């Protein structure tokens, strides 16, 4: 693969002007805020991630990438998440 180090301006923060660095910093902060708001309003994401980690820690697979691929492509997963959402709404 070709070495792209330093060939495209902007890949490295040290090549940015102070104004560009400030804009980049603001963009990163805004992106984090937006992501946090999304995660807080979409309970299904929390259920997906916590379910994955729970299963991974219980089963302790040797090949984690393969386990993750199998977990997230399980055709039953959407229904499991839907049922958990319903269960949590009833409990609230």
Swiss-Prot record:
Domain RIIa: 43-77
CDD domains, per database record: DD_RIIAD1 (cd22971)
Domain of life: Eukaryota
PANTHER family: RIIA DOMAIN-CONTAINING PROTEIN 1
Protein name stated in the entry: RIIa domain-containing protein 1
């Amino acid at each position: 693969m070709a070495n792209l180090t330093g060939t495209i301006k902007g890949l490295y923060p040290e090549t940015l002007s102070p104004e560009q660095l400030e804009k980049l910093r603001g963009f990163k902060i805004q992106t984090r805020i937006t992501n946090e708001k999304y995660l807080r309003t979409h309970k299904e994401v929390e259920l997906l991630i916590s379910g994955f980690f729970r299963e991974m820690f219980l089963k302790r697979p040797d090949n984690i990438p393969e386990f993750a691929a199998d977990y997230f492509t399980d055709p039953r997963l959407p229904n499991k998440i839907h049922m958990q959402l319903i269960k949590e709404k009833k409990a609230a």
